[in-house]
């Protein structure tokens, strides 16, 4: 999948040049062709075994940009303690975007002067602590850990992850207070240094005295084409959370900033609006036991040392924790022409059992806290009404999506149906598509025995959080075995079938993950092979089965998958898993020893137990705990493809932290991850059904840079309460921010598994990570294409474009043939851009294109003489031909192409171009007049049903082709 994304980017490099030159529609695909792919086309991430299941709903078109609206399903298995979102268990609504934050240490924006050391305590203000040449030396680490005023402040930057419009990545603050971005395309991150106050009441909390710290207002991310994406900006677009049981003491933290605005370079905008919903909660079970800790010292009677011991074991009931979340829900998306509204309703779905809250309620009742229990759920903080207050926790479901035009007419809609019963988790059952009041196509979904899933916090989950149908009592000797995966129960609740509007269906057959290798206790040291395969929690795809008729008799196994290293030898009997578990599971630590820094003779030995295993360290890549180095995809005709991926066992191990204070170590401590390097395709081999190799493709990669973020965890604690003898702990580590990008593809074609014909393609990138050069093997030589973009030139226009982060446009493109050390220029094209400030100060358009063959002088091939007030090209010369384009429907579509005419000729007949174009409906009478009066011109005209498609094309001879759509906006007749 990563390679597919990169190849898409290579194609887009050409679109940046030619997409601005107007081209009228040439044809439309047939209704049959437009319905292809309605079943069975389910791409799979072979490395993780997770199929990409997506239901496309609608594409919002804004000029040349498309904003897809879809639903996607994450088919990795069901974690029963994770609450479903508003479109049901496993499903996500894909539209707009979000920036989500992982808080490290304390929030980067933390600044509350009401607390001692709270002023400017977040990393955003404290970044300079890592702006030292010896930041990763143990001596400096200990200085920070032992200094109260330093260690009590944030030394570990938060991670901000983004996902919008096909862009995914993360950004983190550097030690120089700059935003460093990791993304496969160049993105600029801006924070406007503004903050927003928390929008929740302070009554009944310590905030009445101390207040809440304000959060980052939001961020603006600019993509390489200059389009700006604004996140946050108002509190209704920001989600917050705090500790569920310590609501009176904790402070609200901003966790997510939602996309509120897209600003295109021509000034058009897409506005996203949100509503603040009722509070919800995410609860979890977290048992932490002190199994016995004590000090050791040898000071003698003249130098008495602190002596203390501890032991603390609690029940399951005392170990429930959680977060109170203040969610937001997308209300609508608005453009100048379209309004998409999202309607939600309260659900009746399964809720957390009251027993989860009762223990903490009992503790509160016997305490003298002085603040109400669960105060944010109380209507009146002076009236305790537990447990009725739990009803203030309300979950919602998305019930309808309504797409309306600027007149308010319903163009298209989707009605979502769920099981929505109090005994089960919310699950999406069907999507009904509506159009102009008609009930139409239906997608429906079937799941594997969802009624078999346990209640929330059943204490019946495996090491990775998946259901295993086994209770896990706190018996330390046997606890590991209680948490082992159960293949049978892993299947409950997973999506099994999608029924499509065409009547066909796709069935999914899943199987548990397995692995043959795992990392050593110190994950950066080695990848160890086991004597046999072991089962892991979660699911991977085994088979995809299609039926075009919806009948079992027509079932066809489209694809079958084998995650093994010995398939070539043993075929379907292959047994040796290629899976690697990204870490070891450990719950008990019996020999963790720390030494005092201010008394060298004192040590503290600790034994600990934690029910939360080492999940933060048990990851391979792409958020999965198991990654597969080798995968076989067997197709319906018995041909098969062998895929090999980068993984721990072929050179992509993580690295240890730079410095660690204490000698004893646990898997909990930070490390330097290289997960960005894992999961990339390095070899693909295509075989016949008889096992004969027909094609081989290998892929090479490089790191885009050596960039990394500095990070530090540091602090100290007292050896014993009430003493000044203390021990320090700390780690410095790196967060790599480079991209792992493809630099070479080599493909070999085989006639009979021997004497292959081999060719390669090499890629070179510029300083912004955009494609600079492609070199292909051709005809005993190499064909090389070079791109020079705006940052290679110092003209005022190019500098202005770079300043506005418009980096992708190509200024010069050249093609050469290289053979025997000689380079021969084949073709050169130059693109000249001009600013269209009458539209916006961010819009630049191609004014002219010059081309030359070999070493001949450049000749003008295209020139745009005039643009309208929206930036559309209206009068051009291509070669020797003058062409006028008439735009209509408020500048949205080309309604006429007039060849062999000038703008003056056209405006002399119909009036000004802008007056014609701004009308909601074109004056086709004026087009008829043009056909009559411009005898030597060739006029081709187009009509449209706005936001649906083209309805007719009439050529210069007066011959017309008509297109008809059904009420659900699908093309049905030509």
PLM features: what roles do these ranges have?
Residues 1-22:
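Bacterial Sec-dependent N-terminal signal peptides
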Residues 41, 618, 927-930:
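Short, P/G- and charge-enriched loop/turn segments at secondary-structure junctions
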Residues 58-61, 78, 82, 88, ...:
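Non-catalytic interaction/targeting regions
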Residues 70-100:
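Acidic, aromatic-enriched beta-alpha/helix-loop junctions
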Residues 23-77:
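N-terminal-proximal low-complexity accessory segments that begin disordered
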Residues 10, 92, 134-137, 141, ...:
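Intrinsic-disorder-associated interaction segments
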Residues 899-944:
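Extracellular/periplasmic ectodomains of large secreted or surface enzymes and adhesion receptors
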């Amino acid at each position: 999948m990563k390679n597919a994304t990169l190849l898409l980017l290579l194609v887009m490099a050409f679109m940046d040049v030619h997409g601005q030159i107007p081209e009228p529609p040439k044809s439309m695909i047939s209704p049959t062709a437009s319905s292809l792919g309605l079943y069975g086309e389910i791409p799979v991430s072979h490395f993780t075994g997770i199929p990409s299941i997506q239901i496309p709903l609608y594409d919002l078109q804004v000029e040349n940009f498309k904003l897809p609206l879809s639903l996607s399903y994450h088919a990795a298995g069901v974690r029963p303690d994770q609450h479903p979102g508003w479109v049901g268990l496993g499903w996500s609504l894909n539209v707009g975007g979000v920036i989500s934050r992982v808080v490290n240490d304390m929030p980067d924006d933390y600044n509350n002067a009401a607390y001692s050391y709270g002023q400017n305590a977040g990393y955003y203000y404290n970044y300079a602590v890592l702006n030292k040449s010896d930041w990763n030396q143990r001596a400096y680490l200990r200085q920070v850990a032992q200094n109260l005023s330093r260690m009590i402040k944030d030394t570990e930057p938060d991670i901000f992850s983004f996902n919008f419009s096909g862009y995914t990545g993360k950004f983190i603050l550097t030690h120089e207070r700059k935003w460093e971005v990791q993304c496969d395309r160049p993105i600029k991150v801006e924070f406007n240094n503004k903050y927003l106050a928390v929008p929740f009441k302070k009554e009944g909390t310590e905030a009445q005295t101390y207040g809440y710290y304000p959060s980052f207002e939001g961020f603006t991310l600019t993509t390489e084409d200059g389009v700006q994406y604004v996140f946050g900006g108002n509190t209704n677009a920001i989600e917050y959370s705090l500790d569920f049981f310590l609501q009176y003491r904790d402070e609200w933290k901003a966790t997510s900033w939602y996309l509120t605005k897209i600003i295109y370079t021509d000034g058009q905008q897409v506005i996203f609006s949100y509503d603040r919903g009722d509070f919800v909660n995410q609860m979890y079970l977290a048992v932490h036991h002190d199994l016995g800790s004590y000090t050791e010292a040898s000071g003698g009677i003249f130098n008495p040392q602190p002596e203390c011991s501890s032991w603390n074991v609690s029940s399951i009931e005392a170990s429930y924790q959680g977060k109170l979340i203040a969610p937001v829900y997308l209300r609508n998306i608005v453009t100048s022409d379209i309004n998409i509204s999202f309607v939600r309703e309260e659900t009746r779905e399964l809720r957390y059992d009251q027993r989860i809250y009762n223990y903490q309620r009992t503790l509160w009742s016997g305490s003298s806290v002085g603040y109400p229990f669960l105060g944010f759920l109380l209507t009146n903080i002076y009236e305790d009404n537990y447990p009725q207050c739990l009803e203030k926790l309300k979950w919602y479901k998305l019930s309808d999506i309504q797409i309306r035009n600027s007149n308010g007419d319903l163009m298209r809609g989707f009605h979502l149906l769920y099981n929505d019963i109090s005994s089960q988790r919310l699950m999406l059952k069907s999507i009904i598509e509506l159009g102009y009041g008609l009930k139409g196509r239906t997608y429906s979904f079937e799941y594997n025995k969802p009624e078999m899933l346990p209640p929330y916090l059943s204490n019946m989950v495996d090491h990775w959080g998946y259901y295993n149908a086994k209770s896990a009592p706190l018996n330390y000797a046997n606890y590991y075995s209680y948490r082992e995966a159960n293949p049978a129960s892993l299947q409950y609740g997973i999506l099994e079938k999608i029924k499509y509007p065409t009547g066909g269906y796709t069935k999914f057959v899943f199987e548990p993950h397995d692995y043959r290798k795992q990392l050593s206790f110190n994950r950066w040291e080695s990848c160890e092979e086991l004597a046999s395969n072991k089962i892991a929690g979660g699911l991977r795809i085994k088979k995809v089965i299609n039926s075009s008729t919806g009948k079992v008799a027509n079932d066809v196994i489209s694809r079958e998958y084998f995650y093994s290293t010995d398939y070539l030898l043993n075929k379907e009997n292959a047994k040796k898993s290629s899976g690697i578990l990204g870490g070891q599971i450990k719950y008990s630590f019996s020999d963790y020893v720390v030494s005092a820094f201010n008394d060298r003779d004192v040590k503290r030995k600790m034994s600990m137990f934690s029910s939360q295993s080492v999940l933060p360290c048990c990851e391979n890549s792409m958020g999965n705990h198991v990654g597969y180095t080798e995968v076989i995809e067997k197709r319906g005709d018995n041909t098969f493809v062998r895929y090999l991926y980068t993984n721990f066992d072929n050179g992509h191990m993580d690295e240890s932290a730079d410095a660690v204070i204490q000698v004893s170590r646990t898997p909990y401590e930070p490390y330097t991850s290289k997960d960005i390097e894992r999961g990339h395709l390095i070899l693909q081999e295509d075989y016949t059904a008889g096992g004969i190799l027909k094609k081989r493709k290998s892929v090479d990669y490089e790191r885009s840079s050596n960039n990394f973020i500095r990070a530090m965890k540091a602090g100290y604690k007292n050896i014993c309460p009430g003493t000044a003898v203390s021990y320090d702990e700390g780690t410095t580590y790196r967060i790599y921010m480079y991209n792992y990008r493809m630099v070479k593809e080599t493909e070999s074609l085989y006639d009979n598994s021997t004497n292959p014909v081999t060719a390669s393609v090499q890629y070179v990138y510029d300083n912004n990570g955009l494609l600079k050069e492609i070199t292909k093997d051709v005809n005993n030589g190499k064909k090389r294409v070079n791109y020079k973009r705006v940052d290679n030139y110092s003209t005022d226009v190019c500098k202005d474009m770079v300043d506005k982060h418009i980096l992708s446009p190509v200024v010069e493109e050249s093609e050469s043939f290289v053979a025997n050390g000689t380079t021969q220029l084949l073709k050169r094209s130059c693109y000249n851009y001009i600013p269209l400030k009458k539209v916006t100060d961010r819009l630049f358009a191609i004014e002219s294109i010059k081309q030359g063959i070999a070493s001949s002088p450049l000749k003008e091939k295209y020139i745009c003489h005039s643009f309208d007030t929206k930036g559309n090209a209206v009068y051009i010369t291509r070669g020797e031909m003058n062409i006028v384009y008439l735009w209509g429907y408020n500048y949205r579509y080309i309604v006429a192409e007039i060849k062999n005419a000038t703008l003056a000729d056209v405006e002399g007949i119909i009036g000004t171009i802008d007056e014609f174009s701004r009308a909601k409906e074109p004056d086709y009478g004026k087009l008829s007049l043009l056909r009559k009066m411009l005898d030597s011109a060739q006029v081709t005209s187009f009509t449209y049903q706005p936001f649906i498609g083209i309805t007719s094309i009439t050529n210069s001879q007066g011959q017309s082709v008509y297109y008809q759509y059904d009420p659900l906006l699908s093309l049905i007749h030509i």
